Amino acid sequence: MKFVLLFGVLLVTLFSYSSAEMLDDFDQADEDELLSLIEKEEARAKECTPRFYDCSHDRHSCCRSELFKDVCTCFYPEGGDNEVCTCQQPKHLKYMEKAAGKAKKFGGKIRKWFG
């Protein structure tokens, strides 16, 4: 009986050690993948398309505003057959940014009063 107990403890110890090594290998692979994604994102972030400029070459290249990323909006001008795409900020996001700015300003006034 002691032999079975000793063998069981040894087996559990070896299993936990091997699973810990496998998790370390997976974590290392995830870190390497994350670093490569960050490098790609930094490279892509340098070449953003400003608001109201043509974004038909890359529809995901619009710049960020203060809080949100602009969206590439495509439309057909009146009487035209060619599609035109420009980076624009949706109205609901514009209003949310204005509200956030006012809330931030109001919070500063409250801090000034009670600060």
From Swiss-Prot:
Notes concerning its domains: The presence of a 'disulfide through disulfide knot' structurally defines this protein as a knottin.
Major subcellular site: secreted
Tissue: Expressed by the venom gland.
Protein name: U3-lycotoxin-Ls1o
InterPro entries for the chain: Spider_toxin_CSTX_knottin (IPR019553), Spider_toxin_CSTX_Knottin_CS (IPR011142)
Pfam families with a match to the protein in the record: Toxin_35 (PF10530)
Secretion signal, residue range per the UniProt entry: 1-20
Membership in a protein family: Belongs to the neurotoxin 19 (CSTX) family. 01 subfamily.
PROSITE patterns given in the database record: SPIDER_CSTX
